[in-house]
UniProtKB/Swiss-Prot annotation:
Residues that coordinate or bind GTP: 28-35, 76-80, 135-138
Native organism: Mus musculus
Role noted for this protein: Small GTP-binding protein which cycles between an inactive GDP-bound and an active GTP-bound form, and the rate of cycling is regulated by guanine nucleotide exchange factors (GEF) and GTPase-activating proteins (GAP). GTP-binding protein that does not act as an allosteric activator of the cholera toxin catalytic subunit. Recruits CYTH1, CYTH2, CYTH3 and CYTH4 to the plasma membrane in GDP-bound form.
PROSITE patterns in the record: ARF
Protein name per Swiss-Prot or TrEMBL: ADP-ribosylation factor-like protein 4D
Gene Ontology CC entries for this record: cytoplasm; nucleolus; nucleus; plasma membrane
Length: 201
């Protein structure tokens, strides 16, 4: 599993006409559990993965009640320090950002905070909704979603950025469905905002 990173990455416009999917990028520090979360969503089971040295991509359909559902084209990008400069190639013009943190690895939360703020405040990502997944809630000593939100200073992100912090576990899938529902709602709200402003003119 995994592909090599390149400077050029597909954007939302290349997916929507063909798949009617929302383009979402999953990033975070190495060993946060990004790939395991991706394959929990795809296969509905826990997959022990190796560190991603490039990227993985999957199309995932999430039910929203009844027969309704939304399709996400998810890009899971490696989190090793040497790969982080390439994150922006994948987040450019994305519909939503998913930032995954290891809730039990508290000594790296400051590093995670710095990377979260750096990528979300990049000029290409201004206003892009951010879902923070506080992963590994199944592990002893894992911080709660509220504590992770505080440690990452999520509320200090730009006022125009919609955010949500969701506790989750790739092992049992806890929290993933409500997290993605929140992400979809934030993306929808952002897409509707320009239309509303035009109507008021």
């Amino acid at each position: 599993m995994g592909n090599h990173l390149t400077e050029m990455a597909p954007t939302a416009s290349s997916f929507l006409p063909h798949f009617q999917a929302l383009h979402v990028v999953v990033i975070g520090l190495d060993s946060a559990g990004k790939t395991s979360l991706l394959y929990r969503l795809k296969f509905k089971e826990f997959v022990q993965s190796v560190p991603t040295k490039g990227f993985n991509t999957e199309k995932i359909r999430v039910p929203l009640g009844g027969s309704r559902g939304i399709t996400f084209q998810v890009w899971d990008v490696g989190g090793q320090e040497k790969l982080r400069p390439l994150w922006r190639s994948y987040t450019r013009r994305t519909d939503g950002l998913v930032f995954v943190v290891d809730s039990a690895e508290t000594e790296r939360l400051e590093e995670a905070r710095m990377e979260l703020h750096r990528i979300s405040k990049a000029s290409d990502n201004q206003g892009v909704p951010v879902l923070v997944l506080a992963n590994k809630q199944d592990q002893p000593g894992a911080l709660s979603a509220a504590e992770v939100e505080k440690r990452l200073a999520v509320r200090e992100l730009a006022a125009a950025t919609l955010t949500h912090v969701q506790g989750c576990s790739a092992v049992d899938g806890l929290g993933l469905q409500p997290g993605l529902e929140h992400l979809y709602e934030m993306i929808l709200k952002r897409k509707k905002a320009p239309r509303s402003s035009k109507k008021r003119r």
